[in-house]
């Protein structure tokens, strides 16, 4: 059973051995995607998954620590990673108008991203009209303002709310409450920094059947806090802790149908852009025959921001 106290120690105890230490001068991933911007334009978005020190918060569902370093990376390492990303994008064609700097934690954690790298990174992505970084709500403040002032384009900060269910949020070990999240969102609004919110579909500790209800309530809370976009992430296993919670009945993985329903229901709110996370969706699908078409449909809805008819399948019986 999941403990009431010392949750971080329990979470860490479930981990498998770390992979080989990553090179602090090489990004974990670099790719391009298409995203509908706040303006309504569908544009190229360059994504770089930065290599840096593990996040100091140990959320029960997180597996991103597997590709992080144990120590802070040297000054200049992040700038070199971004330089490699820009070179990769340039080799693929025109540079993207939006850049996402994701780092398996918080961009504003100085132990993860040295503040001395902000200026050289900003210079390297001066071509970007819009830049997205991610952060823990408790780290939103002066460093966010500093980065905003260095960028040529506008700044957006993605915050992982995960859920607006107070009891579940506490058990996730996020170590903030809804009031603290709302204050971070207010700081961003005052500083004219856009807000994106990450939400989980079927987080652990929810009553059976309450997943859709609470992802909609969580989206309503996020939009009320000023979010211009929410990303719906199906809760995954793979970090040890989630497997234990599944075995104890405290977590039931979402299905592809539940992700589709969440996207449809949150989009129907009409409050902002809604993106379904389609990374590594195969484990959530029960039918290999219609999986690719259903994933493509989710991605089309992401781009067009309008609901589409469900994908029929003669094999699994979907209408």
Named regions from a protein language model:
Residues 65-81, 85-113, 124-140, 154-181, ...:
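Core AdoMet radical
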Residues 111-119, 140-150, 208-209:
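Distinct, well-ordered alpha-helical segments
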Residues 179-241, 259-278:
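Conserved C-terminal portion of the radical SAM core fold
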Residues 88-94, 121-126, 144-154, 186-192, ...:
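Acidic (Asp/Glu)-rich catalytic clusters
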Residues 20-69, 87-101:
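N-terminal pre-triad scaffold of radical SAM enzymes
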Residues 44-46, 97-101, 131-133, 155-159, ...:
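Hydrophobic faces of well-ordered beta-strands that scaffold small-molecule active sites
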Residues 1-27, 33, 37-38, 223, ...:
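Auxiliary Fe-S-binding modules of radical SAM enzymes
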Residues 105-107, 137-139, 163-165, 201-205, ...:
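Active-site-proximal loop/turn and secondary-structure-junction residues that shape catalytic pockets
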């Amino acid at each position: 059973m999941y403990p009431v106290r010392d949750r971080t120690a329990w979470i860490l105890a479930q981990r498998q051995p770390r992979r080989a230490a990553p090179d602090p001068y090489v990004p974990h991933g670099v790719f391009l995607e298409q995203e509908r911007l706040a303006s309504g334009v569908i544009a190229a978005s360059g994504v770089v998954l930065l290599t840096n020190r593990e996040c100091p918060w140990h959320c029960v569902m997180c597996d991103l620590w597997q590709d992080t370093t144990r120590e802070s990376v040297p000054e200049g390492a992040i700038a070199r990673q971004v330089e490699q990303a820009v070179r990769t994008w340039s080799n693929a064609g025109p540079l993207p108008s939006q850049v996402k700097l994701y780092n398996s934690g918080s961009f504003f954690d100085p132990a993860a991203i040295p503040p001395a790298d902000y200026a050289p990174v900003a210079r390297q992505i001066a071509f970007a009209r819009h830049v997205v970084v991610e952060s823990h709500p408790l780290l939103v403040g002066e460093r966010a303002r500093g980065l905003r002032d260095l960028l040529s384009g506008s700044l957006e900060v993605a915050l992982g709310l995960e859920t607006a269910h107070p009891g579940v949020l506490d058990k996730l070990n996020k170590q903030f409450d809804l009031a603290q999240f709302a204050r971070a969102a207010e700081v961003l609004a005052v500083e004219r920094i856009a807000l994106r919110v990450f939400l989980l579909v079927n987080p652990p500790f929810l009553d059976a059947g309450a997943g859709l209800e609470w992802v909609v309530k969580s989206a309503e809370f996020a939009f009320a806090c000023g979010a211009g976009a929410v990303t719906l992430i199906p809760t995954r296993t793979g970090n040890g802790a989630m497997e234990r919670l599944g075995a104890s009945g405290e977590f039931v993985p979402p299905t592809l149908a539940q992700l589709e329903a969440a996207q449809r229901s949150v989009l129907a709110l009409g409050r902002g852009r809604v993106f379904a996370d389609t990374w590594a969706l195969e484990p959530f699908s029960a039918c290999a025959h219609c999986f690719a078409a259903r994933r493509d449909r989710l991605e089309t809805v992401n781009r067009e921001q309008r609901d589409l008819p469900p994908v029929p399948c003669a094999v699994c019986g979907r209408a």
